[in-house]
Amino acid sequence: MVISVEAADYTAFPCAALLVGCREDNPLEDSLLARIDQLLQGAIASLVQSREITGELNRVTILHTLGRLPAERIVLVGLGNSGALTSDRLRQVGGSAVKALKGAGVTRAASVVHRAAGVPPTSVADIAQGLSLGDYSFDIYKTKPGTTVPVTELVNLFEPGTDTADAERLLAADATICEAVSFARDLVSQPGNVATPLFLAEKALEFSARLGIACTVLDRDEMERQGMEGILSVAKGSHQLPRFIVLEYRGGSADKRPTVLVGKGITFDSGGISLKPREGMERMKDDMAGAAAVMGAVMAVAGLRLPVNVIGLIPAAENLPGGGAYKPGDIVRTMSGQTVEIVNTDAEGRMILSDALFYAQRFKPAAVIDLATLTGACLVALGSAVSGVMGNDAALVKLLRRAGEATGERLWELPLWDEYGEIMKSDVADLKNAGGPHAGTITAAWFLQRFVGKSRWAHVDIAGTAWEEKGRPYQPKGATGVGVRLLVEYLKATVR
């Protein structure tokens, strides 16, 4: 969908549908809506009176204009109470609107939602983001085309004579971010027989070449030379060879230390010898959602040309129960030199991240942030509406949580007290890779903390948020691309 702006009279603009915001509190006190009602000879007022139009958030009503306006339809989108409008609610409005447009078979539409009473001027970007993200679908493997007609164009209409340069800049930046989110969603949606470690490496090389990002891919031999046994041990059960992907975007000054982003890249997780149950195992193609988020974030940062230095590290491997697979009871010497007793081969994410976090130290980072679908315990504790965050630096965690509130990719902090470390002690190695049934999200993060050295570090557990089971206004069912917008917003905040 191409989203643009134009300074034109909405009452004279021909289109298949005109999107109009409708607040819940006294909707017809909005002069724009009142003007449209007048042109429709009181049709809206009548429906408000009968409570068929309420302005309830995300509720959509379609009215045919019957030639009274050049727009064939008025699509009224509920904004809720004007005092409760937030950026995320506006994204929801955009997502609800695009679903209604597609359902009505509209291909070309216009919008004045951003001009509704009580809506801030910059809302055009939030609404557009909801439209773009809500329009996503993954259907490349379907052999028969669907019946839904895509929305190809949406024009945001401003008052005639308005300087639209600022809005155009906002929409251009928004399009770059949404493209990166769609890229991440596509990666996570790919089946495990396609999205292998090599596939991730090839995708990284492709977009890096296009955007001028340095990309290095370490193969198994190089990983062995560097002692990355945390990653290599996990990969031993699969015929798919592991890869370690290094992305380097240098948009800041040479003396500015980089932010290192680390993404878990288990392209399929069977659990290994500690095999997962059959039910739901097909979803384990999403165990590389952290890697997808990091790749998408680096793509967006480069596309936006942010004046920051960012390193993306992606350890990529499959976790399968082959003849050479690592086993419970094995002891693995990680890249850091620390030894780990394997008590659960399904706790593989922390093993590959241990090497990546240690590798990150060579960049002398300003901060290290890892994203991972690390623990089912996080889904149990927090559900699917929020990701868990832990770290060793309160200011870093606070900035990430602020970015989460701004983007709707919210975070909830869990503690990392020393007592949790007792659970991870091993009788035969420096530590063990799983701590039993209690506090699983926290003990996993505590394990990771052992490999970050003195770096400022935060861990984001996206196990509950990487996949949407039912679908929400701007998050269709399936891969969410969570983390891309969060990381971009955080990085933008570091240069404000």
From Swiss-Prot:
<comment type="function">
    <text>Presumably involved in the processing and regular turnover of intracellular proteins. Catalyzes the removal of unsubstituted N-terminal amino acids from various peptides.</text>
</comment>
<comment type="similarity">
    <text>Belongs to the peptidase M17 family.</text>
</comment>
<dbReference type="InterPro" id="IPR011356">
    <property type="entry name" value="Leucine_aapep/pepB"/>
</dbReference>
<protein>
    <recommendedName>
        <fullName>Probable cytosol aminopeptidase</fullName>
        <ecNumber>3.4.11.1</ecNumber>
        <ecNumber>3.4.11.10</ecNumber>
    </recommendedName>
</protein>
<feature type="binding site">
    <location>
        <position position="264"/>
    </location>
    <ligand>
        <name>Mn(2+) 2</name>
    </ligand>
</feature>
<keyword id="KW-0031">Aminopeptidase</keyword>
<keyword id="KW-0645">Protease</keyword>
<dbReference type="Pfam" id="PF02789">
    <property type="entry name" value="Peptidase_M17_N"/>
</dbReference>
<dbReference type="InterPro" id="IPR008283">
    <property type="entry name" value="Peptidase_M17_N"/>
</dbReference>
<dbReference type="GO" id="GO:0005737">
    <property type="term" value="C:cytoplasm"/>
</dbReference>
<dbReference type="GO" id="GO:0006508">
    <property type="term" value="P:proteolysis"/>
</dbReference>
<dbReference type="InterPro" id="IPR043472">
    <property type="entry name" value="Macro_dom-like"/>
</dbReference>
<dbReference type="InterPro" id="IPR000819">
    <property type="entry name" value="Peptidase_M17_C"/>
</dbReference>
<dbReference type="GO" id="GO:0004177">
    <property type="term" value="F:aminopeptidase activity"/>
</dbReference>
<feature type="binding site">
    <location>
        <position position="269"/>
    </location>
    <ligand>
        <name>Mn(2+) 1</name>
    </ligand>
</feature>
<feature type="binding site">
    <location>
        <position position="346"/>
    </location>
    <ligand>
        <name>Mn(2+) 1</name>
    </ligand>
</feature>
<feature type="binding site">
    <location>
        <position position="269"/>
    </location>
    <ligand>
        <name>Mn(2+) 2</name>
    </ligand>
</feature>
<keyword id="KW-0464">Manganese</keyword>
<keyword id="KW-0479">Metal-binding</keyword>
<keyword id="KW-0378">Hydrolase</keyword>
<feature type="binding site">
    <location>
        <position position="348"/>
    </location>
    <ligand>
        <name>Mn(2+) 2</name>
    </ligand>
</feature>
<feature type="binding site">
    <location>
        <position position="287"/>
    </location>
    <ligand>
        <name>Mn(2+) 2</name>
    </ligand>
</feature>
<feature type="active site">
    <location>
        <position position="350"/>
    </location>
</feature>
<dbReference type="GO" id="GO:0030145">
    <property type="term" value="F:manganese ion binding"/>
</dbReference>
<feature type="active site">
    <location>
        <position position="276"/>
    </location>
</feature>
<dbReference type="InterPro" id="IPR023042">
    <property type="entry name" value="Peptidase_M17_leu_NH2_pept"/>
</dbReference>
<dbReference type="Pfam" id="PF00883">
    <property type="entry name" value="Peptidase_M17"/>
</dbReference>
<keyword id="KW-0963">Cytoplasm</keyword>
<dbReference type="GO" id="GO:0070006">
    <property type="term" value="F:metalloaminopeptidase activity"/>
</dbReference>
<feature type="binding site">
    <location>
        <position position="348"/>
    </location>
    <ligand>
        <name>Mn(2+) 1</name>
    </ligand>
</feature>
